[in-house]
Each structure stands twice: as structure tokens, then as C-alpha cells.
């Protein structure tokens, strides 16, 4: 029976930490070319929103969306996260035509999110999407689309 080594050298931990931060910093810098007119218009739409910013997404995109909503709310912008599946169970009532939906999906083709979009459109709520696929259905149905490309997760 072998004994598990529970000690990791500090240099190794530090090296992994530094590498992760470098990769995250580079991933952010890689987004600069995608800051186009749609980005400017999307920011303007959210800034001038008379209601709430409703952030939505499924899976990891949902987790990112929840963080975005929490950050917006904590800095003074009325915002919350809604799981697109929850709208079928009464959460649609919190939305009005004064709101803006910020929809996140890496593929832009997430089935649960795409079933939610017609309800948003029916309520005349503008949609800003952030996806890795500018030709996706989600991008197509959005007022403004922002492309984000993620090569690798740190």
C-alpha cells in the first residue's frame, strides 16, 4: 500500500497560479477585436434601460450570467438572473417591455434558451446576446449580438 503525498511544492503551485492568470488575461485581451458597434449599442441599451436587465443562460453560461446579474445589481443596475426553464413555472410575470434581456450561450443554439426567446420577442423585450457563434439562431433573433471566442478554459 502506498502513502499519498499530500504536499505540493510551493513553486509548482505558484507556477500553476501564474499560468492560469496569464491564460485568463490573454483570453480577455483576445476579445478586444470583437468590441464593435454592436457592443457599443448593447452597452447603450443596457445603460438606458428603464426596467431591469434580465440575464439568462443554461449550464456554465447560466453560472456566468448569474455572476453578471449579481455584479450589475451590486453596482446599482436593477438586474437578476433567470433560468430559461423557470419561465414555464411562473417567472415570466417578472418581465416587462421596459426590461432588456441579456442572453448568454457559447453555441447560440441552446434548445432551452431558444424556446424562451419567442416569449421575450412576444413581449417586445429587446435581446442582447453574447455567443461564440455570430451565425447562431440566438444571434439572429437578437437586437444586438456580441461575439466572444473562448479558446481554452484556464
What label would you give each PLM region?
Residues 1-2, 6, 12-51:
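An N-terminal, well-structured beta->alpha segment
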Residues 51-154:
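Glycine-rich phosphate-binding loops that contact phosphosugars or nucleotide phosphates
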